[in-house]
Structure formats: structure tokens, C-alpha cells
Amino acid sequence: METKSLSKSTICCFGDSTTWGDNGCGAGGNDISWTSHLGALLGGAVVENFGIKGSRIAIKADRTDSFVERLDGIDDAADIYIVFGGVNDFSRNVPLGELGSTDVHEFYGALDYLIRTITARSPQAKLVFMTPCKTSGKHEKDIPASDELNHLGLT
């Protein structure tokens, strides 16, 4: 089997605080983010970090930086798109919706929008989704742990 080198690839990383590079103490940045190491690990690939702390995949009225709302600001010419998010949707009670939903105010509908929009704009690109990391819920904010119910009764 032939392995394709990713060293000449452009990779767009779209996410929340984990992508941004949050250190868990209110600071951080791209220099400590997993994205800053990815390019070197792949032999020099160009890696763009589009992480924003606290952002959600779905649209909610209290913020304007959801993945859906930020999609127009990302690179349409990337070879690979990595979408790493969902923990803020869970912790901030975004409804899941139903599979097949196109409502961008629900998690499933927002994911549908991301997939359709990215693949329409960049049909040659690979699309990778990373699921949120398990959380302990030990935080100064009222955020449930991964194994606790959120206010919608979901885990």
C-alpha cells in the first residue's frame, strides 16, 4: 500500500478552546495547541488554527462565534479540514435535534450544514471530525462532566 505524504498539505483546524490552545487556567494560545505540533509531525504541512474558546458547533443567541457562523472565514483551499468540537454544545445545552435536521440551532442540523458547506466549497478535501475529550467537570463554571446529565438530560 502506498502512503501519501501530507508534508505539502494545508490543514484547516476548526474548533473551540481545545483547538485554540487553552491551558485550562484561563491562558494559552496557538503555541501550546495541538495544531502547532501537527505541521511538524506531518513533515511541514501548513496548519491553520481556527479555534475560538467557548465556541459551539450550533448557533445560540448568546454568542456569534459558532462554527456555523465562522465558516465563511476559513480557507476554502485546504486539503484537509479537521472539525473538533461539541463539548460546549453539550455543556451549554444545545438541543441535539433529529438526524437529518437542517436547523443550525440544533447540533445535528449544524453538523449537517458544516458537512454540506465544506464539501460543496472544497470537494477535493478530506473532512475529519474529532469528538470531544472526556471532561471531569471540575471547573469554575457550571459545566457538567462527560458522564453527568446536562440541563437537557443528555450525557
Write out the residue ranges for each language-model feature:
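Conserved SGNH/GDSL esterase-like catalytic core that processes O-acyl groups on lipids
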Residues: K8-C12, T18-G109, P144-D147
